[in-house]
Each structure stands twice: as structure tokens, then as C-alpha cells.
Amino acid sequence: GYNLAKVVLNLLYRVTVDYQDEAALERIPKRDVVVYAMNHRSNVDYVVVAYVLAYGAHVSYAVGEWARVWPLEYVFKSFGSYFIRRGFREPLYHAVLEQYVHLITKNGVTQGFFPEGRLSRDGRLGSPKLGLLDYVCRTMLDPAFDRDIWFVPVAINFDRVLEDRALIRELVDEPDRPGRLAQLWTVMKYLGSNAVRLVTGRLKRYGRAAVNFGTPISLREWLASAPGVLQLPKEQRLPQLERLAALLMERIGAIIPVTPVPLAAAALLSFGQTMIPKAAVLDRMDQLRDRLGAVNAKVVRGGARIREVWDRAWRMLRMRRLAVEEGDSVVVLPRGRPLLEFYANSIAHLLPIRSPRVPFHKTHEVDADLPRLRRSGEDGGGRGR
């Protein structure tokens, strides 16, 4: 899977990797089991983590059945994935799945899973699901299993999520809701078009894909503070495991990478107006970056000049037609607001400034107060698309 991941990512992003406590990761005993718990931003998450961990470990993922089509089935199997039916209620199926998870855990297989259980539709971190977490934890009940299990929080963020418009449509209009195959088709189209651009020398990457690894959590230590939890009946056990799931999500949220586009989106939306002086945007970005530094947030290229960070973000905002320049001001286009909210939401929990809520709804694509813009080929012209 490494070679494929490398090709795909080089077509799309510049990858940044950082560690909250690399020494703690290195101290995990080799014989213990490592489980990476990740937030779920994009279907590209699998590829990003496979690429980052290629020389350290092969990771077994739980992937939905939507991926069991050629060539995706081959791709995900090359990353060590197994396929599950999400939302399937058949008890026998879950009994078999639980035994499979126990088997790979007892044999020391490194695993990766997404506690949220689905892609984020609005950009925010979602509530955790408990199924796979419960299965992994209950491996500790096996008398022959004498290892520890370490949960490693992994936070992923992008300057561009390939499926962002499709994800937002799920919150906009029920009849227009795309299926998972439609989302994957969007990703495949991007890969194809970028492959053509690579051959013709016109390749432009979509900014940063950033991955941060957090401080690992020892399951044995956690269970020592909650003795007898795994022996409880399921209806009593799961509420207790919610505390572990919440701890994982808290750790993930604390290390979410702040790439240029989410930072710029948060700054733009914090004003609550359509036209904003560019100097004010840069000042607000600088203020937000200082705040992020104060809470030890992981800011990508945090030492760069704020104008440089803005320029990197602006290339994406302009290319996506989310905003245009009007003299010395930046104008947020109405159709761009939901996408800006999507990216700003990814770091909203780290910031004191809350942008005005802009519901994901079609009525917000028309803004009577938007100034009439001059047409220019580079800006996309008119009132946006």
C-alpha cells in the first residue's frame, strides 16, 4: 500500500507530520498492541495514515462495505483493511466480527479505526461510536492475553477535503444526498484529473494534509482506574466505555492540525460580514494563531509570516471561488459560506471566537447585501458560482 499511497498523496497534497510526544510512542513495548484512533475527515484518511506509517507498521482498518468494488477493494486490502457492515443489526454478524477483532488483537496486529464511525458532514468532530472500541477492549478478558493495548490518538486535517461539497449537500437537501459511491467517484475524478495535470506539467496540489500523533493511552492503566468494567453486561459496560471514548476524542481534538485554509476561514467568518478589509483579516489571523499557540495547538508552519500563511490559504479560496478580492478588501461569496464554515469548524473547538452560525441551507446562497463585483477571469466573475 505504501507505493500507491505515495503516488496518490503526491498528486494531491503536501504532507506534514508532527508528534505531541514522540518519546512516549517509542517507549511502547514492541510486543504490545497499538491501535490508532483517528478523526474522519475524508476517504483519503486511509491513504494518508498508510503513507505516514508505512515504515513503522502495517495497519488493519475497518472499512465500510461501500468500498467493496474494484479497484477500491484491492486498494483498501493493500492497506490491510477488512470490511464491515455499518448499521447491520444481525446478532450473528456482530458475534463473528467481535471474534475477528479479538483474533487480530490477540495476534498483535496493529489496527486503525475511526471512533466517529463516519465522515464529518459539517467539519466538526463527531460523537464516538463504541462497537469496535468495545470489541478491542474485551480482548483483555482472554486469560492467555498478557500484553497491553495502547490507543494512539491521531488527528488529521486538510486544506481541501475532496468530498467537501458532497458532504455538505447531505446537510442541505435530503433528495440530493449523494451515496458513498458518489463520494468515492468524486475522489477518483480528482485523482484522474490530477494524473493528467501531472503528465502535462500543470499539477497544482490542494495545499496541506497534516497528521498529528498524540500521547498514547494504556488500556491496562485505564482499566485499573475502572476495575470490573469489561465484566459488566453490555448495557452497563458501554456507558462506562463512553468515558474512554470521550478521552480519545478529547485527545484527538487537542492535536487537530491547523492548516492555512481552516485558519483563514475562521478569521473570515469571525467578522460576520461580507466585505472585510484584508489588513483586518491578516490581523485576525495573527490573533487567532496567537490564541492557538497559547493552548498548545498544532499550527502547521506556525513560525511563518502571517502574510505567507494567508497567501497559501488564498490560493485555495480563490481556486474554489469561496471569496474574491475587491480593492483592498476580501469579499466572501454567498455560495462559499457553507464551505468556509466546514473548514473553520475543524478548529472551532480550539478558538475563543465563534463565527456567526450560517445554516447549511440553500436560502443562504443568495445575499442581497453582497456588493456587485467586477468580472475578472481569475476571480471567477460575477457573484460566484
Regions found by a protein language model. Give the residues of each.
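Membrane-interfacial terminal anchoring regions of lipid-handling membrane enzymes
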Residues: 1-385
